[in-house]
Amino acid sequence: MEKASMIYEGKGKKLYNTSHPDQVVAEFKDDLTAFNAEKKGNEAGKGALNCQISTEIFKLLEAEGIKTHFIKQLDEKNMLCKRVSIIPIEVVTRNIATGSLSKRLGIKEGSVLPFSLVEFYYKDDALGDPIMNDEHAILLKCVNSQEELEFLKETAREINEILRSFFDSKGLNLVDFKLEFGKDIEGNILLADEISPDSCRFWDKKTNEKLDKDRFRQDLGNVKMAYEEVLRRILN
């Protein structure tokens, strides 16, 4: 599938039109960003790793009945996807307290939550992607109804159950992760974006070593090695 004009460039990917009106190509970038792009870096090979990791996870989820925008991986950095209109909500699911949750509510980092917590954030870089509730989402017309919000929550929880079990079998704790959804031309809500160490936190079950973008956020080093380790475990 040939790329045509670029539609959009985000922090981690570029999106391109194709000859098919309902399909786009997502090119995964080597760029690293943190703290709403206040911190920037680059890691050669990171884009290819995220593309392959996302491919494997989308395949897993599709096999479990989750509808996604994924069609196929084209090459090491490019993925063919269904065209969707992104819903401006970041759906964050948390299993272990860390990051902004610990800072915001004073929950000790590393505390296992008694239930999986699903949060909504308004997808707006200029505002810093603020946390919001259901009524905010409807007020801002992010969705058409409360039913659509419930679908996002239920799907996030279903994905969480699938991925927690999968990564547990690989010796990894799925600490938390961010999902994005979009609507296809028929109005169906599909899982979109990516699922990778850029959008998930993975901790080694034995050592609690961080194997995700926190290595960049916190200047821990060995970012590429961490992403490679996640991919190795997924494939083994």
UniProtKB/Swiss-Prot annotation:
- In which pathway does this enzyme or protein participate? Purine metabolism; IMP biosynthesis via de novo pathway; 5-amino-1-(5-phospho-D-ribosyl)imidazole-4-carboxamide from 5-amino-1-(5-phospho-D-ribosyl)imidazole-4-carboxylate: step 1/2
A single BP term in Gene Ontology: 'de novo' IMP biosynthetic process
Broad enzyme group: ligase
Which GO terms of the molecular function aspect are on file? ATP binding; phosphoribosylaminoimidazolesuccinocarboxamide synthase activity
Enzyme Commission numbers on file: 6.3.2.6
Sorted UniProt keywords: ATP-binding, Ligase, Nucleotide-binding, Purine biosynthesis
List the catalytic activities from the record.
5-amino-1-(5-phospho-D-ribosyl)imidazole-4-carboxylate + L-aspartate + ATP = (2S)-2-[5-amino-1-(5-phospho-beta-D-ribosyl)imidazole-4-carboxamido]succinate + ADP + phosphate + 2 H(+)
Q: Which Pfam families match?
A: SAICAR_synt
Family as reported in the entry's similarity comment: Belongs to the SAICAR synthetase family.
What HAMAP family does the annotation carry?
Answer: SAICAR_synth
Report the protein name in the record: Phosphoribosylaminoimidazole-succinocarboxamide synthase
Organism expressing this protein natively:
Wolinella succinogenes (strain ATCC 29543 / DSM 1740 / CCUG 13145 / JCM 31913 / LMG 7466 / NCTC 11488 / FDC 602W)
